[in-house]
């Protein structure tokens, strides 16, 4: 049994949902948090006041869609250049492959991410459309997998080892938390992991078939299917394979070596763009990794959910609008985790409010000056976790 009651407020800032207790669970599949001590309630009240005063729609879909129109256009143009449909020199095609890799990711960081949190408009069909268009059809991945890994898993159990699907399990080449058993290879992870991050885009397309569809698991999270596995595997994957692999090779006559080189460039670019943005926000020398105590029945984690969201995140580059656009507002990670159902385009306005309440309640709120500073803190954490002789914390 998973306790998700704490998240009603984060998806209903204006408190339209009334939670009715119908019983008390004897045990839980995953750890539970301490009850809110008034910190999150005050945050919600202040954010509600902001929207009441400004009259802004917390889920206004226009912000994201308008920003993505030029990105979609650039996506199509760079695709045509890469495949030779628009004649161009080799350097131009290589540059187009880089641009295509970024444009494959930007819609995911903007409209897909908001759609997965019901933060783009007020229509369920709209959430499905934007999510499946950008993640399933354009990127060849799985919205079902993302819902379980990210929305149900990571956002609920952020940085909780054994519960957060974003943290490594045993036998992986990365050591992020002290509870993982140390191995000699980890002393070099601060060098090789930033390179391996480029494989993320390719990896997730295999993972959502091998684990989500075949094993019914997304990391430690059990999968509840809400549509046809056969449709997702054969239609979506087939569509992506057709336009990314079969058409260039079989219809447009792109030489295999040329296609392979450009394909690898674009996919590595997508992987790096995703992974580097994801990792710096939570895997850092400045973030908190809650430790759960398996024997406890209630309040296994020594902190409330809202305070955990602040302590497990790092923000950066608040003053840089380009950074905010290029990372899909992931540089406002703490604000996003506290209010995932609010459109990311409101985060710059909400951040000062959140920081003020955090200061009042003595909850540390970490902001780095730039992405470079956040990335340096990530590398420092990789280095520290790889040091020889660090015992696993049980």
Q: For the regions a protein language model found, what residue spans apply to each?
A:
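Membrane-embedded catalytic scaffold of the fatty acid hydroxylase/desaturase
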Residues: 99-226, 289, 293-389
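Active-site rim elements
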Residues: 2, 181-182, 250, 259-263, ...
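C-terminal, active-site-flanking charged/polar segments
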Residues: 265-279, 283-284, 354-364
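Membrane-interface, cytosolic juxtamembrane amphipathic helix immediately N-terminal to a transmembrane helix
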Residues: 44-66
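C-terminal regulatory/interaction regions
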Residues: 391-394
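Alpha-helical bilayer-embedded segments of polytopic membrane proteins, i.e.
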Residues: 59-108, 135-139, 187-202, 225-277
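Histidine-anchored, small-residue-rich loop motif
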Residues: 1-42, 72, 76
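Short, charged cytosolic
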Residues: 27-49, 199-216
